[in-house]
């Protein structure tokens, strides 16, 4: 199990897997710290068979890969992302380098690369370079516009304040994805407020016209 961050919606599922303990958890030291203190999932799971979880540290931006023994045909690389820490965290609005990561998965046999980015607040140069090398991009499509949550009276914050670059606009992700010729582009982490979820909308049709896909439950991806 790889945790890219310690957001509640990304980590709470571990509790549903409690009867399968112990689990091998791969995450940064920053995420592990939060999951043992302010959101203590790791401590809670110690009460189940096998001692709960075993932590393996991920070091972002390392020049060497990390491997997972049960997946010997693949190697993994972690990249720090500028996004945000969870609302419960003391590091909210002042995230550390290891609070959010993207992960590249490489098939050793084919050389194909998948880059997984569930939260993007800023597009740094090292992230753009990695995106350009990927064969498949799985990246966040949380919001269509930056003020979507404000206009819908769901929040008082812009998407970028929450750590999410919107899809639309001059500085949106669509503009960036249009510059990348190599990868297949698939959106994940799509908020319920995002109009692209409705196939009858102009926003959905515009997205598809740019060659960008929307992920779905049960989707199978090979590299």
Question: How would you describe each model-predicted region?
Answer:
Residues 1-27:
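Active-site metal-binding motif and surrounding structural segment of the metallo-beta-lactamase
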Residues 31-36, 64, 146, 193-197, ...:
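Short, charged/polar "capping" segments at the starts of alpha-helices
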Residues 98-100, 108-113, 120-219:
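Cap/insert and terminal regions of metallo-dependent hydrolase folds
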Residues 11-17, 35-38, 127:
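Hydrophobic packing residues within well-ordered alpha-helices of enzyme cores
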Residues 52-55, 76, 212:
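Generic structural signal for residues in well-ordered beta-strands
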């Amino acid at each position: 199990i790889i945790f890219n961050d310690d957001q509640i919606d990304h980590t709470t599922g571990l509790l549903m897997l409690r009867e399968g303990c112990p689990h091998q958890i791969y995450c940064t030291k920053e995420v592990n710290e939060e999951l043992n203190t302010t959101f203590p999932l790791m401590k809670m799971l110690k009460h189940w068979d096998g001692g709960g979880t075993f932590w393996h540290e991920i070091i972002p931006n390392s020049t060497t890969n990390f491997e997972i023994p049960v997946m010997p045909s693949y190697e993994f690389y972690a990249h720090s992302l500028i996004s945000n820490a969870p609302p419960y965290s003391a590091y909210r609005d002042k995230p550390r380098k290891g609070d959010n990561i993207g992960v590249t998965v490489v098939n050793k046999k084919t050389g194909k690369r998948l880059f997984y980015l569930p939260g993007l607040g800023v597009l740094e140069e090292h992230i753009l370079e990695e995106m350009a090398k990927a064969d498949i991009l799985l990246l966040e499509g949380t919001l269509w516009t930056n003020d979507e949550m404000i206009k819908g009276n769901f929040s008082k914050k812009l998407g970028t304040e929450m750590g999410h670059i919107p899809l639309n606009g001059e500085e949106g992700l669509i503009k960036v994805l249009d510059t990348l010729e190599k990868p297949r582009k698939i959106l994940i982490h799509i908020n319920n407020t995002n109009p692209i979820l409705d196939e009858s909308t102009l926003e959905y049709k515009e997205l598809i016209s740019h060659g960008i896909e929307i992920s779905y439950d049960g989707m199978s991806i090979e590299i």
